[in-house]
Structures are given as C-alpha cells and as structure tokens.
C-alpha cells in the first residue's frame, strides 16, 4: 500500500460522501488477519504522530497546581486543579464529559495517585490516562506533539478505525498520515503488512473506499 494507492482511495472516499455544512473527518479503517489478539503481545497499543498534523485542534487537559497550572492556563489549555479533581471524583457524569471532550491529559507527577482515584475509572477504559510530568516541566513540546498525535488500541479486536485528517487537507497530506499508521503496523509484526486483510478510507458521512494492495 503506497502513497498513490492511498491517495486514490481518499479521492474515492470524497466522492462517496455528500457535502455537509461542517468539515468532515477522514478515517483509516484496518482489518487485521491471522493474529491471536487474545495474546497481549499481538495487540496494537500505540500513539502515532501524524506527519501532516491533524487539520484541527485537539483539546488537552492539564491536571496540575502552582507554576505548572499557571503555565497551562497561559497556553490556553484546560486546567484541572486539585479541588476540581476531587469534585470530579464525586461526579461521574462530569468526569465522563471531561474525558470525552479532551483528546489527551497531562498530570503533575505528584498528583497521579489522586488522578488514579478520581479519574482513573473514567480515563482508563478510554485509553486516556495522563502523561505524568514534573512540576517544573516545559509543557510546550509535549503539547505540540499531542496536537499531532492519534492513539490506537485494538485490545482483542481485529479491526481498528483511526482519524487521519479532515476533508480540508490535501490527498497527499492525508495519505502521508495513513502511511505513518501503516508503517507502525508493518513494524509491529514479523510479517508486516501481510497481516492487513484490508484497509479503507472514509469520510464522516460517507461510505468506505478500499485501498488497493
């Protein structure tokens, strides 16, 4: 599956989606084969930096206090301080809303025990447990990386679907992002892309377009 084949599928996916009054996302769908995914070592659990970026902003929440909280606030990130964290632990509905609204979480390392107790039951199943950082960390590089990152966690399922851009991006940009994900799949398994049964691209409101092998 090279860039030209992926670009062809992206072009087809565009034709299969009716115009909408919002910018549609583009996803990559991958079906895996001949893998025992009940074995943890065969599962894909990766964070992948998309070379072309995501084409949209990613909301990031920082669980912190003191200087780190102030730095996060200056960067326009969502800040969750200790008292708010404790309240979220008592309000599962609010905790779920926070979890669903944010793509990634960063937490001051010495607050991780409280994070685990208050938000762990909500963030854990979503694969969004925070990245711990020291209280004097420079958040800028980590935030920049997260804004270009997507997460894959197949668990025991042979199919995964992952965001690779928006319809406003060029076919080349979207294809480069898809290639980055397929390269991770290829490196994960000894037989590489042999384990990909099929792959597709799809816009939010459109049908899936197959990527030729």
Swiss-Prot record:
Pfam families: Ribosomal_L1. The keyword Hydrolase does not apply. Transmembrane segments: none annotated. Gene3D superfamilies: 3.30.190.20, 3.40.50.790. GO terms for biological process: regulation of translation; translation. GO terms for cellular component: large ribosomal subunit. Keywords: Repressor, Ribonucleoprotein, Ribosomal protein, RNA-binding, rRNA-binding, Translation regulation, tRNA-binding. Probably involved in E site tRNA release. Binds directly to 23S rRNA. Part of the 50S ribosomal subunit. Belongs to the universal ribosomal protein uL1 family. This is Large ribosomal subunit protein uL1. It comes from Methanococcus vannielii (strain ATCC 35089 / DSM 1224 / JCM 13029 / OCM 148 / SB).
């Amino acid at each position: 599956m090279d860039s030209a084949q992926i670009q062809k599928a992206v072009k087809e996916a565009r034709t299969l989606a009716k115009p909408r009054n919002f910018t549609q996302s583009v996803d990559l769908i991958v079906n895996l084969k001949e893998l025992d995914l009940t074995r943890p070592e065969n599962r894909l659990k990766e964070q992948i930096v998309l070379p072309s970026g995501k084409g949209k902003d990613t909301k990031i929440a920082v669980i912190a206090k003191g200087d780190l909280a102030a730095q996060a606030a200056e960067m326009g990130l969502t800040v969750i301080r200790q008292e708010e964290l404790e309240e979220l632990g008592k309000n599962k509905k609010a905790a779920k809303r926070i979890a669903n609204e944010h793509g990634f979480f960063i937490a001051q390392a010495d607050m991780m025990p409280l994070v685990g107790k208050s938000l762990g039951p909500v963030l854990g199943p979503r694969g969004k447990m925070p990245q711990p950082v020291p209280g004097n960390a420079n958040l800028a590089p980590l935030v920049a990386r997260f804004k270009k990152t997507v997460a894959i966690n197949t668990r025991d399922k042979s199919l995964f679907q992952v965001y690779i851009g928006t319809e406003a991006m060029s076919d080349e940009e979207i294809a480069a992002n898809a290639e980055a994900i397929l390269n991770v799949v290829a490196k994960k398994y000894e037989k590489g892309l042999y384990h990909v049964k099929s792959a597709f691209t799809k816009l939010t409101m459109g049908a899936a377009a197959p990527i030729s092998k």
